Every structure is written in structure tokens, then in C-alpha cells.
Curated annotation (Swiss-Prot):
Residue numbers annotated as active site: K279, R353
Keywords tagged on the record: Aminopeptidase, Cytoplasm, Hydrolase, Manganese, Metal-binding, Protease
GO BP: any one term: proteolysis
Catalytic reaction list: Release of an N-terminal amino acid, Xaa-|-Yaa-, in which Xaa is preferably Leu, but may be other amino acids including Pro although not Arg or Lys, and Yaa may be Pro. Amino acid amides and methyl esters are also readily hydrolyzed, but rates on arylamides are exceedingly low; Release of an N-terminal amino acid, preferentially leucine, but not glutamic or aspartic acids
Residues annotated as binding Mn(2+) 1: D272, D349, E351
CC cofactor: Mn(2+)
Protein name as it appears in the record: Cytosol aminopeptidase
Database matches in InterPro entries: Leucine_aapep/pepB, Macro_dom-like, Peptidase_M17_C, Peptidase_M17_leu_NH2_pept, Peptidase_M17_N
Localization, UniProt: Cytoplasm
Claim: Transferase is one of the keywords in the record: no
Encoding gene (name): pepA
GO molecular function terms listed in the Swiss-Prot or TrEMBL record: manganese ion binding; metalloaminopeptidase activity
Source taxonomy: Bacteria, Pseudomonadati, Pseudomonadota, Gammaproteobacteria, Pseudomonadales
Length: 497
């Protein structure tokens, strides 16, 4: 779908479908009044009959109104005379998109300037959410279907904006388009079956991305290099699988050479059986999504590349497959990490933190401004925050605050959890420096505490996306593309873009 921005009168625009908002109690905004006047009161007449109550997201399609160049007019309810919340605004846009997809028109014009959104400016903030909602709603994953989804007739959507705000709306669309591209890439990787999407496949994806972008350098560390670097925890996770582990390093130089980079670390467990600590069989197919941390880093990088942000960014993807076998890691094994700290592996299903801890140590060599790791790390985070909010922890209040703010601006929210010293005690082991689990209580926090022991050399934050990275079961099952909006917004803010 192509999104364009124009500053023209809605009543004079030629299009297959013109979309205008109508409030409750038959209230018409400036745009609706102009269209009503041009159509000789057709809008008012419909509202007087009570055909549309004007509640947010309600729609009514009108055909061939006199005095207009539009073939159809789609009225959409915008509610009472007050600003909408982000969720209501997104639902309104999705409702419009749903109607447009069912029509045979190749284009549509959205004249929604009169709708206010709470805590969003009238141009960039509001239209960024609108554009992301439209573009993300276009996503289809039918790669393995013998019958593909029929191509939609709607190819172009024009957003009408006032002249003063046109440049900001265009900027919003540019950013939204890049984020949507990144989210789609993230969702594609997450939705791929694990027999195809394994560590070596992700390494090939990185190499292809590197070939397409001169500013991006790619290095892939194989299992021998991982072992030679002393990454005993990382190596242990993959040793039970026929698919060898890979540490993928993508280095984007968009800023000045002297600028310290931001580092994103993604957990890339391409399939997680739990290892010897085997998971239950029911729902195990969804463990292909255990690489969504790495997928979201990939997606964020795609957005950054498309926008050519003036920042230096290093992406580290810690990829392995966690399988049981005669060579797999056992509960009770003790490994030495790259940092020199030893870990007693009490549960092989707590493997994400093992690949991450060595990768966090590896990140020190880049002398980063900040390091953010992203992982589908704990089921406890789903219990605590559900599927709406990402868990966030860190050792630097400024960094955590910046990420929380980015989440609000991107409507991709996170919530901070504590890393108090008392939780660290739950990781004590009688045989090693620490265990890899901290007991049944506060599992998300103790996982963060574990990682914090390997991130003391820099400002660090940990994002647990176990609840937000994918939707379980039902017709909407699949990867969500989160937290690409949050991460991209964070980097946009750092770049001043």
C-alpha cells in the first residue's frame, strides 16, 4: 500500500472512497461540514435519519453523492467532542481499513484532521499511529499456503493534511513506513517454521542484508569461534542440536566514526524444546517464537537502514537451538562464561539467559553508549504483565526512562520492574558462582538479575518480550513485530530525527 500526503479540499478530491469523520449527536467538524455543503446536505440528511450514531469506529458507506467527485463517502464515527485515546484511535483506523479492504476501489482519501488524539500532536503524533496501523494491517503470511490470499484492490491511500502540517505528516508517514517494514520482517522471521529458520538461516539473512547496504558490516561467529572465545554458557545451549549455534554481528555505521555505538542484543533460540528439562508437548510448536528477540533486532535494523539514521548501531544475535540428545547439557552441569564467572545449569529450559550472558560480555569490546537486550525470556513475565506490556529492567535510570518514554510515544509500552539486591540472593549456588534459575518467585526479575551480572561495564537495559512478541492460538496466532516500534523510536530520539 502506498501512502501519500496532500493538502487539498476534501469536497473537491477525486477518489474511489472519501473517508470523513462524524461525531456523536450528529456533530459535523469542519471537513464534514464542507462535504455536506458540497453534497447539498446529504450527510446531514443521513444523520437525521439516525443511520449513524457517531460512536468511535462505527461506519456508514454512502454511494454517488451529488456535488462530489468521490464515488463513495465513508462516514466514520469519531465519538463525543473530546480527544480519543491511542487504542480508540487505532481501532477507528482499523475499522476504516476493514471497510476499504472489502471494496473494489483502488484508492481512498482519508480526511481525518478533525479527529483529535489525546497526548498526540495534530500532525506527526496522530498520523504516525494512523500510518502504522494501516501498514501493519496489510501484513499477510501465506508463504506455505497452497492458496494465496487474493491481492487487495486498494493500492493507494492519500492522507489529507492542512498546509501548515503537511511536512510533519509526511515525516510521520516516512517513519511509520520504515517501522512497518521492520515489523513485517520481524513477523516473517518469527512465523517461519523451525525446520527452515535455524541459526545458520538467520546468519544467511544477515549476510544478504549486508550485501544490500554498504554501511552495514556483517560477521558470523561459528560454534568453534564461540567455544574459542570462552563462551561456555552460549556453547552449552547449542551442543545438543544438529544445528550449530551462531553469534551474528551486524555493525551499522551511520554516525561519526568517533561516536560510541548503541548495541542491541537479541535472543535467537530458533526452537526451544527445553532441552533435557523438556517442555510439555502441548503448545510446543510456539517455541519457534523463542527467536523473536533476535527477529525484533533484525527488524529494528531494517527500519534504521531504511531511514539512514545518523547513529552507530551494533546488533548481536545470539542464535542456537535447544534440543535434547546424548550430547545435550544436563541439569547440574557447570559452565564457565566468557566473563570468567561460573554457572550451575539447574534447568536447561532457562537457556536464553545463557546465550545472552556471554553475548553481553562480548558487547564490551564495542565500548557502547548503551546496551539493550531483547528476549522472550520468562513465562513469569506473561503472568505479571500479560500480552500488552513488555517487562523492562536496567542498571541506569536514564536509559530505562528513555525506553519507557519511547514506548509511550510509539504506543509500544513497557513497564519497569525492580532489580533489588535481595533478588540476587535467589541465584546463589553451593557449587558455582550462581545458578541459572532463582526459584519460583519473581522469575522475570531474577532472570534480569542474572543478566545484570554480565552487564556491569556499561549502561544496560533488559526487555522481556515473552508476552508481547507473539499471539498464542486462534486465528490471529503469530508474531506481532514488537518491540520494533519502541526500539526504533528510541533510536529516532537519539538521532534527533
Amino acid at each position: 500500500m502506498e501512502l501519500v500526503v496532500k493538502s487539498v479540499a476534501a469536497a473537491s478530491v477525486k477518489t474511489a472512497t472519501l473517508v470523513i469523520p462524524v461525531g456523536e449527536n450528529r456533530k459535523l467538524g469542519a471537513v464534514a461540514k464542507a462535504v455536506d455543503l458540497a453534497s447539498e446536505g446529504a450527510i446531514s440528511a443521513v444523520l437525521k435519519r439516525g443511520d449513524l450514531a457517531g460512536k468511535p469506529g462505527q461506519t456508514l458507506l454512502l454511494q454517488n453523492l451529488q456535488g462530489l467527485k468521490a464515488e463513495r463517502v465513508l462516514l466514520v464515527g469519531s465519538g463525543k467532542d473530546e480527544a480519543l485515546g491511542d487504542r480508540t484511535w487505532r481501532k477507528l483506523v482499523a475499522s476504516v481499513a476493514g471497510v476499504l479492504k472489502g471494496l473494489n476501489g483502488a484508492d481512498a482519501v482519508l480526511a481525518l484532521d478533525d479527529v483529535a488524539v489525546n497526548n498526540r500532536d495534530a500532525h506527526y503524533g496522530k498520523y504516525r499511529l494512523l500510518a502504522e496501523t494501516l501498514l501493519d494491517g496489510e501484513y499477510v503470511f501465506d508463504r506455505f499456503k497452497s492458496q494465496k490470499v487474493e491481492p487487495r484492490a486498494l493500492k493507494k491511500v492519500t492522507l489529507l493534511a492542512d498546509k501548515a502540517g503537511q511536512a510533519e505528516v509526511e515525516r510521520a508517514v516516512k517513519h511509520a513506513s520504515a517501522i512497518a517494514t521492520g515489523m513485517a520482517f520481524t513477523r516473517d522471521l518469527g512465523n517461519l517454521p523451525p525446520n527452515l529458520c535455524h541459526p545458520s538461516f538467520l546468519a544467511e539473512q544477515a549476510k544478504e542484508l549486508g550485501k544490500a547496504h554498504k554501511a552495514l558490516k556483517v560477521e558470523v561467529l561459528d560454534e568453534k569461534k564461540i567455544k574459542d572465545l570462552g563462551m561456555g554458557a552460549f556453547y552449552a545451549v547449542g551442543q545438543g542440536s544438529d544445528q550449530p549455534p551462531r553469534l551474528i554481528v551486524l555493525n551499522y555505521q551511520g554516525g561519526k566514526k568517533a561516536d560510541k555505538p548503541f548495541v542491541l542484543v537479541g535472543k535467537g533460540i530458533t526452537f526451544d524444546t527445553g532441552g533435557i528439562s523438556l517442555k510439555p508437548g502441548a503448545g510446543m510448536d510456539e517455541m519457534k517464537y523463542d527467536m523473536c528477540g533476535a527477529a525484533s533486532v533484525f527488524g529494528t535494523l531494517r527500519a534504521v537502514l531504511e531511514l539512514q539514521l545518523p547513529v552507530n548501531l551494533v546488533c548481536l544475535l545470539a542464535c542456537a537451538e535447544n534440543m535434547p540428545s546424548g550430547g545435550a547439557t544436563r541439569p547440574g552441569d557447570i559452565v564457565t562464561t566468557m566473563s570468567g564467572q561460573t554457572v550451575e545449569i539447574l534447568n536447561t529450559d532457562a537457556e536464553g539467559r545463557l546465550v545472552l550472558c556471554d553475548t553481553l560480555t562480548y558487547a564490551e569490546r564495542f565500548k557502547p553508549q548503551a546496551v539493550i537486550d531483547i528476549a522472550t525470556l520468562t513465562g513469569a513475565c506473561i503472568v505479571a504483565l500479560g500480552s500488552h506490556t513488555t517487562g523492562l529492567m536496567g542498571n541506569n535510570d536514564d536509559l530505562v526512562g528513555q525506553l519507557l518514554d519511547a514506548g509511550k510515544r510509539a504506543d509500544d509500552r513497557a513497564w519497569q520492574l525492580p532489580l533489588f539486591d535481595e533478588y540476587q540472593e535467589q541465584l546463589d549456588s553451593p557449587f558455582a558462582d550462581m545458578g541459572n534459575i532463582g526459584g519460583p518467585k519473581a522469575g522475570t526479575i531474577t532472570a534480569g538479575c542474572f543478566l545484570s551480572r554480565f552487564a556491569k561495564a556499561y549502561n544496560w537495559a533488559h526487555m522481556d518480550i515473552a508476552g508481547t512478541a507473539w499471539i498464542s492460538g486462534g486465528k490471529d496466532k503469530g508474531a506481532t513485530g514488537r518491540p520494533v516500534p519502541l526500539l526504533t523510536q528510541y533510536l529516532l530520539d537519539r538521532a534527533g530525527a
